Amino acid sequence: DNGWAFTFSGALNTGDGYIRGTNYEGWTYFGNISKKINDSHKLSLTAFGAPQWHNQRATKHYIEDYKNSPDGGRYSNGYGCLNGALTGAGYGYNYYHKPQVSLNHYWTINANSSLTTSAYASLARGGGRRVAGNKTNWLTIDYNTGRPQAGAMLTPDGLFDYDAVLKANAESEHGSQVAFTNVVNSHDWYGLLSS
């Protein structure tokens, strides 16, 4: 009405994943507000993005690990429970969000000519979990074998024992011996296009 148009949508996708310990959450959103100023000029503001996080399985395992596991091909040992939630260990978690926003101007100069101009921005933030400290072996999988590092703190069923790690960190005379960190990938893109 009065030359205005509005469109908005969004969705949430969440689940446990096919592989054990690979739970995930992903949102998507889209929004557009457009205005027809007159027969020669239109403006359109658009924003969209898809923030997500996911746990992931270690990249390598021996075939016998799959065969010997009751989970078969769904087998994973690179996670544990932290505060009641499945939590991937070092190299077992990623997150990312790269929203994009653009303001477009459409100008019909005459019957034979037009000019479209777009100003845009994209502000990306994301990263992946790592472990740091003197005892990283408590919470890491050996990249070559897919098995926990020697000295890893595990529950009786072979998952990472975060409670034991928290207890050992709290009791250490030298502060925390291992901690989760994130390797971050961020960038800001801006631009102006006209054709």
What is the meaning of each model-derived region?
Residues 24-26, 96-98, 124:
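Membrane-spanning beta-strands of outer-membrane beta-barrel proteins
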Residues 34, 42-106, 118, 129-194:
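Acidic/polar loop-and-plug regions of large Gram-negative outer-membrane beta-barrel proteins
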